[in-house]
Regions:
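Active-site gating/metal-coordination segments in enzymes
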Residues: 44-179
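Mid-to-C-terminal alpha-helical segments outside catalytic/metal-binding sites
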Residues: 1-41, 68-76, 97-101, 188, ...
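Active-site-adjacent C-terminal substructures of enzyme catalytic domains
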Residues: 166-170, 181, 187, 211-212, ...
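Active-site gating loops and adjacent loop-to-helix segments of metal-dependent hydrolytic enzymes
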Residues: 1-25, 148-169, 206-230
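Conserved N-terminal glycine/acidic-rich loop preference
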Residues: 140-143, 147, 167-178, 182, ...
Length: 305
């Protein structure tokens, strides 16, 4: 979701969408878009650039306002909206406090985390207090990319969503896996946005990394493939015959979820994604039903009601 007050906050902070496009969002427009594409329910989230623009107190206030709105939308339109809580990272005390409020008081469905915060990727020791609490709660965590500081220094003219986003998610996934955080915090259900970035395409490369280099944990290939199957993956901007076959080789089939990236990606892309899933080679009716609905019902049991 991208309510007016949130868009104004990141504009005032000098931020912009990585596509350069203007974004429109209201609950009514969301419902119209969902109805037009046969979408029964959306799990809303605040994605990049998050809510922390340099001031801890302001970030706490903005996170609270976003999360309370998300809860309000779920109450106003029951069965149509759920939500992932946004946290005021990298400020850890505020993030832990908001996590408790959002999950215990507001009853949100999980948490969205950027792949990196203040230059530190998920799996970094500095973020372990948060992962420990998420693990204790067996939380669902959507991992969404951002623009790592290093991406801004590359000198490439292309919008960040085209390449830097998928690399950012991939870096976080690799760090979670090879740092051991994915195993240490095994109760967390991590969803990787955008089909896991480039992870499906380089999964075999990752599996032979221990054979090539002493700098990575000396694990057998199957342990690495099993780690990659522990992630959940959404299909935002990768629901085509180009990408889905690779994703289906890497992910457990019951851990692939439909994602749209709307409103940052236009509604036309949502329609193309739905058609792409139908037409992708190897996607059976059963697998398509899982991606479009059944897998989400397993991840969010409350939706059964």
């Amino acid at each position: 979701m991208a309510p007016d007050f949130y868009r104004e906050a990141f504009r005032q902070a000098g931020m912009a969408t990585t596509s350069g496009a203007a974004v429109e969002w209201t609950p009514q427009l969301a419902l119209e878009t969902m109805d037009a594409h046969g979408i029964a329910m959306s799990i809303l989230s605040i994605s990049f650039p998050g809510v922390h623009f340099g001031d801890d107190r302001a970030a706490r206030a903005l996170a609270r306002r976003c999360n309370e709105l998300a809860a309000e939308l779920g109450q106003r339109w029951p069965g149509r909206f759920g939500a992932f809580a946004v946290l005021p990272l990298p400020e850890m005390e505020g993030a832990l406090a908001e996590l408790e409020f959002a999950l215990d008081k507001l009853k949100l469905d999980g948490v969205i985390l950027l792949a990196s915060h203040a230059g530190r990727f998920l799996g970094d020791p500095a973020l372990e207090p948060l992962l420990a609490e998420l693990d204790r709660r067996s939380a669902v965590v959507l991992v969404h990319p951002g623009m790592h500081p290093s991406s801004r220094t590359l000198g490439l003219p292309w919008p960040g969503f085209m390449l830097e986003f998928v690399i950012d998610t991939s870096r976080a996934a690799i760090n979670l896996l090879f740092s051991g955080a994915l195993e240490r915090f095994g109760n967390i259900k991590f969803i990787l946005a955008h089909g896991g970035g480039v992870i499906p395409y380089i999964s075999w490369r990752l599996s032979v990394a221990p054979i090539i280099s002493p700098l990575v944990p000396q694990w057998p290939q199957e342990r690495i493939f099993a780690g990659l199957r522990r992630f959940w993956y959404d299909t935002a901007l990768c629901a085509t015959g180009h990408a889905l076959p690779a994703l289906m080789q890497t992910a457990a089939p019951e851990r692939i979820l439909f994602g749209s990236d709307w409103p940052y990606a236009p509604a036309k892309v949502t329609g193309l994604s739905i058609e792409g899933i139908k037409e992708a080679p190897g996607v059976t009716d059963r697998l398509r039903a899982g991606i479009e609905r059944d897998n989400a019902l397993q991840l969010f049991p409350r939706l059964h009601g």
